[in-house]
Every structure is written in structure tokens, then in C-alpha cells.
Curated annotation (Swiss-Prot):
Its main location: secreted. Contains an N-terminal substrate-binding domain (CBM18) and a GH19 catalytic domain. The CBM18 domain is involved in binding of the insoluble substrate chitin nanofiber. The CBM18 domain is not required for catalytic activity, but possesses antifungal activity. GO terms for cellular component: extracellular region. GO terms for biological process: cell wall macromolecule catabolic process; chitin catabolic process; defense response to fungus; killing of cells of another organism; polysaccharide catabolic process. Residues 35-68 form the Chitin-binding type-1 domain. Keywords: Allergen, Antimicrobial, Carbohydrate metabolism, Chitin degradation, Chitin-binding, Disulfide bond, Fungicide, Glycosidase, Hydrolase, Plant defense, Polysaccharide degradation, Secreted, Signal. It is found in: Secreted. Has endochitinase activity. Hydrolyzes chitin oligosaccharides, GlcNAc(n), with different degrees of polymerization (n=2-6), a soluble substrate glycol chitin, and an insoluble substrate beta-chitin nanofiber in vitro. GlcNAc(6) is hydrolyzed at the second glycosidic linkage from the reducing end in addition to the middle linkage. GlcNAc(4) is further hydrolyzed to GlcNAc(2). Has antifungal activity against hyphal growth of H.rufa. It comes from Cryptomeria japonica. The N-terminus is blocked. Pfam families: Glyco_hydro_19. This is Endochitinase 4. The lineage of its organism: Eukaryota, Viridiplantae, Streptophyta, Embryophyta, Tracheophyta. Residues 1-34 form the signal peptide.
Length: 281
């Protein structure tokens, strides 16, 4: 026997379907509150939404604690500016006996760079090249030309006991590690929360995992300081020095400022871009 829908049942079906569509749209709006990303501790999906899980952190993930196992893209984004040859010319000067020799790899850098939306990709070609040169210049200075992974002969465990949000773990030290020498428990804790590693209980991973090491440096550059804004808004390389170590500026340590500037000029030349103005701080 054929069942015929009555007018009322058709109406009910219509309103039920409409309600379902509205509900789905509301859910999408709720998920998309952080559209275009920048949400602390979450992944930015390939469609520009913040969240967690494979749909957000998997293939196409743009920034945050991405888990995609896909090989890093080297033809677009930062990879189109920094080829493996250019990268090796920048970091390859470390002597064979240096701990950093072989640690700072191209694939790790590209993976870290691609995890942060806008890093080296948010401006004109010249602006993007200057940002990459500025990042590497400060990293080269901090690591002795990429010779070191960890701070040499630290005189402190860099534990701020007054910081209750990121309390120090017993027996752990939070001395400088990685390209920008991540230091202090509160920075390890915050970076770990954003990138998703245990920065407080396992700070050593910043000195043993090349990708995480680079990610902490790009995190500091993009999230924890105004380095990215400074170099992309025309404030000049000197503003990145002030953001990283303001004590060097205004005559505080002319030699270290000169070291950073020399690296910056060298890397700008390698990337075929002028340095811009305001190199000192």
C-alpha cells in the first residue's frame, strides 16, 4: 500500500529540515568564531578555523600544534623564499664540532614556518625577505652562527618561582635552548601550551627535537613578542633587537647589536633584498 504524505506532514518535514539547516549553520558559526585563526593553543585548519583534532590539526593545518605528517611544502610560502641551498648557506657555517651542526635542518625550519600563519608571508616580497633575514640574523647571533643548541655555561636555572601559571618542575632548568634561546619557565610553559609539548616537565626536548626547537623560535617571533609586527610594519631591524633583548639597546651593548646587524646585512644580501632603514636600536 502506497503511503501518501499529507499537507501537514509535508509542512512538518519542511520545518524539520529547515530547523536542521539552521542548527548546522549555528554550529558552524560557533566553530568559526575564531575564523582566520590566531587562537592560543589551537590549530588553524586549512579553511581558517580554530579547533583541535585531525580536522583542524591534520592535512592543510596552517598554524598552531599541527599534526600533519605530510612533507613540508617548499614551493610556496616561506619555502619559495628560502630554498634548501639558501638555508644551508645561512646555517651551514657551523664547524663540524658544533652541537648545532646537523641539528638545524631545512625540513624542520619549513615545518615550523608553515605552522604559523603570516610568518614570512604577510607582506610584499621585500618585506617577507627582510622578515626571514631578520629572524635568521637574531637566531645566528643567539646561537653563535648556529653552532650552539643550548646556552653555554648558564649561571641560572631561569626559574621564576613567583609565576604560578607555569610553575617550575623539580630538577628542571629553563636555560636558553633553540634558535632564539627560549628561556624561563613561563616561556617554556606558554610555548609548550601553544605548540603542544610539555615545556615544564620536558624542557630538554627544545634541545633535542629540531622541529620543536624551530617552532619555539617562530612562536616567540610571532606570538610572544612584537618581532613580526615590527619588521613587517616598517619599524626596521632594530625594533626586533629591542623586542628580543632591550637591554642591548640605547648603548647597553653596542657589540651585540653590531653582531646582529652584521648578520642581518649578510642575510639580506643572500636573499637579494635591501636592508631597509633603522637597523640599530
Amino acid at each position: 500500500m502506497q503511503i501518501m504524505a499529507t499537507q501537514n506532514s509535508k509542512s512538518n518535514i519542511f520545518w524539520s529540515s529547515s530547523a536542521s539547516v539552521v542548527l548546522v549553520l549555528l554550529l558552524l558559526v560557533d566553530v568559526g568564531v575564531c575564523q582566520n585563526c590566531g587562537c592560543n593553543g589551537l590549530c588553524c585548519s586549512q579553511y581558517g578555523y580554530c579547533g583541535s583534532g585531525e580536522a583542524y590539526c591534520g592535512a592543510g593545518c596552517k598554524e598552531g600544534p599541527c599534526s600533519s605528517s605530510s612533507p613540508p611544502s617548499t614551493g610556496t610560502g616561506v619555502g619559495s623564499i628560502v630554498s634548501s641551498d639558501v638555508f644551508n648557506s645561512i646555517v651551514g657555517g657551523a664547524a663540524s664540532g658544533c652541537a648545532g651542526n646537523g641539528f638545524y635542518t631545512y625540513d624542520s625550519f619549513i615545518s615550523a614556518a608553515n605552522a604559523f600563519n603570516g610568518f614570512g608571508t604577510s607582506g610584499s616580497s621585500d618585506v617577507n625577505k627582510r622578515e626571514i633575514a631578520a629572524f635568521f640574523a637574531n637566531a645566528a647571533h643567539e646561537t653563535g652562527g648556529f653552532c650552539y643548541i643550548e646556552e653555554q655555561n648558564p649561571t641560572s636555572i631561569y626559574c621564576d618561582a613567583s609565576n604560578t601559571q607555569y610553575p617550575c618542575a623539580s630538577g628542571k632548568t629553563y636555560h636558553g635552548r633553540g634558535p632564539l634561546q627560549l628561556s624561563w619557565n613561563y616561556n617554556y610553559g606558554a610555548a609548550g601550551s601553544y605548540i603542544q609539548f610539555d615545556g615544564l616537565n620536558n624542557p630538554e626536548i627544545v634541545g633535542t627535537d629540531s622541529t620543536i626547537s624551530f617552532k619555539t623560535a617562530v612562536w616567540f617571533w610571532m606570538v610572544n613578542s612584537n618581532c613580526h609586527t615590527a619588521i613587517t610594519s616598517g619599524q626596521g631591524f632594530g625594533a626586533t633587537i629591542r623586542a628580543i633583548n632591550s637591554m642591548e639597546c640605547d648603548g647597553g651593548n653596542a657589540a651585540t647589536v653590531a653582531s646582529r646587524v652584521n648578520y642581518y646585512q649578510k642575510f639580506c644580501q643572500q636573499l637579494n633584498v635591501d636592508t631597509g632603514s633603522n637597523l640599530q636600536c
